[in-house]
C-alpha cells in the first residue's frame, strides 16, 4: 500500500528520484500514465495488469469507454528504476501534468501520483474546505 507525500525535483533530463518508501512496492519496472486532475498515475505491474483486464472488458460500442481507454493507454509508459532510484519521465507526460522542476509524489493506496507542486497545493487548498462534506458523502460507501 502506498501512502504519504514527498517533495522531489525533476532534473533537466526529465529524471526524478522515486521516494525510497515507494520503490519496493513499485518494483524495478512499473507503469506511469496520465491520471485524473492533471496528475500522473504510477502502478506496479501487478496492479496495472488488473486494471488492463478491467478496461479491456469495457464495450467498444460505448463512446466514453473508447475515449477513456484511448487516453489512459496512449499515455502509458513502462518506467524502470536506475541504480540511483530514478525514473525518466516521458516528455508528453511531463507536459500533461505540467511537471517542471518541483514535483509532489503521493501514495494513494494501490498507486502513486505525481503532481506539479503548484497544482497540488492549489488542489489541497480547494479540497481542505470541502473535506468534511466529501467525507459525509462517502458514508454510503461503508468507509
From Swiss-Prot:
It is found in: Cytoplasm, Nucleoid. Gene3D superfamilies: Transcriptional regulator MraZ domain. Its main location: cytoplasm. InterPro entries: MraZ, MraZ_C, MraZ_dom, MraZ_N, MraZ_sf, SpoVT-AbrB_dom, SpoVT-AbrB_sf. Keywords: Cytoplasm, DNA-binding, Repeat, Transcription, Transcription regulation. One of its GO terms (molecular function) is transcription cis-regulatory region binding. GO terms for cellular component: cytoplasm; nucleoid. It comes from the Bacteria. One of its GO terms (biological process) is negative regulation of DNA-templated transcription initiation. PANTHER family: TRANSCRIPTIONAL REGULATOR MRAZ. Belongs to the MraZ family. NCBIfam families: division/cell wall cluster transcriptional repressor MraZ. Forms oligomers. This is Transcriptional regulator MraZ. It comes from Bacillus licheniformis (strain ATCC 14580 / DSM 13 / JCM 2505 / CCUG 7422 / NBRC 12200 / NCIMB 9375 / NCTC 10341 / NRRL NRS-1264 / Gibson 46).
Amino acid at each position: 500500500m502506498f501512502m504519504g507525500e514527498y517533495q522531489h525535483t525533476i532534473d533537466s533530463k526529465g529524471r526524478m528520484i522515486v521516494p525510497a518508501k515507494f520503490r519496493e512496492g513499485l518494483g524495478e519496472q512499473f507503469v506511469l500514465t496520465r491520471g485524473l486532475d492533471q496528475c500522473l498515475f504510477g502502478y506496479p505491474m501487478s496492479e496495472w495488469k488488473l486494471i488492463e483486464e478491467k478496461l479491456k472488458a469495457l464495450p467498444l460500442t460505448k463512446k466514453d469507454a473508447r475515449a477513456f481507454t484511448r487516453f489512459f493507454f496512449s499515455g502509458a509508459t513502462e518506467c524502470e528504476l536506475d541504480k540511483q532510484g530514478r525514473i525518466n519521465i516521458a516528455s508528453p507526460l511531463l507536459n500533461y501534468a505540467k511537471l517542471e522542476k518541483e514535483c509532489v509524489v503521493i501514495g494513494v493506496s494501490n498507486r502513486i501520483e505525481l503532481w506539479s507542486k503548484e497544482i497540488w497545493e492549489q488542489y489541497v487548498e480547494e479540497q481542505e474546505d470541502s473535506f468534511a462534506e466529501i467525507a459525509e458523502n462517502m458514508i454510503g460507501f461503508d468507509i
